[in-house]
Design a protein with these regions (language model features):
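Short loop segments at secondary-structure junctions
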Residues: 1-3, 85-87, 106-108
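Cysteine/selenocysteine-centered motifs that mediate thiol-based redox chemistry or coordinate metal-sulfur cofactors
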Residues: 1-3, 12, 18-26, 110-123
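A short, polar/charged loop-to-alpha-helix boundary motif
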Residues: 97-115
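Internal catalytic-core helix/loop-beta-alpha segment
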Residues: 9
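CN hydrolase (nitrilase-like) catalytic-core segments centered on the catalytic cysteine
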Residues: 5, 15-100
Length: 123
């Protein structure tokens, strides 16, 4: 990226915080985490996990997510979102329809949040 370093993972990786800590220590400022959480696990964990990874690493998170009922009957949660390093959801997709989301981000928020919560210097 011309404007920063992107750390990439997928779906179930979201449950392993050490992966994101390693990506951050290697310079990641943004995470891309495409996922297909089931409706049940998504409803229970999706928002919390995405926001937590953003907060604990001081990174923006781009989280595209499958939504709807698929040919095999599997129902995925959706809720694609972009979260800032403070854990604020900047934009979120509607659960009931496929759509493209976008927002303007301020990359200065990365340094600001990392200075406010200097967890990267502790471990």
């Amino acid at each position: 990226l011309l404007w920063g370093k992107l750390g990439m993972s997928i779906c179930y990786d979201l449950r392993f915080p050490n992966l994101y800590r390693k990506l951050t220590k290697k310079g990641a400022q943004f995470f891309s985490i495409p996922a297909a959480f089931t409706f049940t696990t998504g409803k229970a964990h999706w928002h919390s996990l995405i926001r937590t990874r953003a907060i604990e690493n001081g990174c923006f998170v781009f989280a595209p997510a499958q939504c709807g009922v698929h040919d095999n009957g599997r129902r995925t949660y959706g809720h694609s979102m972009i979260v800032n390093p403070w854990g604020k959801i900047l934009v979120e997709a509607n659960i009931n329809k496929k759509q493209i989301i976008s927002t303007t981000i301020n990359i200065d928020e990365i340094e600001y949040c990392r200075n406010k919560i200097p967890s990267m210097t502790k471990f």
